[in-house]
Amino acid sequence: MTSAERVAVVGTGLIGTSIAMAAVRAGDAVRGFDADADALARAAERSGLVPAGSLGECVSDATIVFVCTPIPSLAGLVAEALSAAPGAVVTDVGSVKSHVTSQVLAEADAAHLARFVGGHPMGGSERSGPDRASPSVVDGIVWVLCGTERTDPAAVERLAAWIERVGASPVRMDAERHDRLVAVVSHLPQVASTVLMGLAATEEAGEPEILLLAAGGFRDLTRLAASSPHLWSDILLGNREQIAHALELYTGRLLEMRDMVLAERARDVESAFAQAKEARLALTAKPQVKAGVAVIQVPIPDRPGVLAELTSALGEAGVNIEDLQIVHSPEGGRGTVYLTVAADAAEEAERFLRARWFEALRLA
């Protein structure tokens, strides 16, 4: 088992405090610093971290430093932490990697760059602040690591070992590839959600009842529109070229759909929906990236208490649910639950569920 680390967290918002909570739970000593004294005090109360009066005090004896501040300040603080913590691996948690990495390479002392590893935990929420933090924010997520040509591979491996110890899955890739991929699966969804919500709000001026008709689908699609405007402005500008390309691809697909609808090409419309449905169901059913888990598919009727019956059955079997996702049928009346459990518990889970008349089927 990996030995305990001395963790320093610079920036105690949602992600920073969640990392602190995960580290404390894993048995690490944790110090934190934030320029906002109130945020630091709330983070200390929630996570158990020891508050520091300065960045230097926070990182002085750390072995791993997480810089968890807004994107514009990341590079400068990473450079400062590298100098103030001569024995520590220093990483950031920014959603944009190429821009931040190039700034770090330009600003930090070249002698310290072997200890810098760019990072991006693929977790979070539309909520913000230390009061919303939880170790579950990083538990089970993919955590991208982007070393540079100057990074010591041992620094990457040390950070990866810590990430695995707190229950996340490290994935190594270069910064440019990271930015291209997250532009599609992380940044574009935020833009689409924001634009759709803005469109509906504008239409409300002429049609006051439009949002009264907004049901579950609209609410699901616009959840991200409640995210921090300041945070997302920094992210979009920091990854502007990749996001612009993703928007071009997305706009092209929307225009294709418009043309198919106007031309009454029913088969093409149905085919587009079918392909997307198949891809979405495959995404839902995929197991966690981490090894040793299994996914069980369970169709359920739409009635009160059925989900409690399902989870109670697994509780009686002593099976821990690592993840649970629900896909609702468009026709209503039924849904499908996808359960992620430990691979060595999957057979027992299936047996208990079938004994209670659930049609459990192991997918992976």
What are these model-predicted stretches?
Residues A279-A364:
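A conserved regulatory-domain signal marking ACT and ACT-like small-molecule sensing domains
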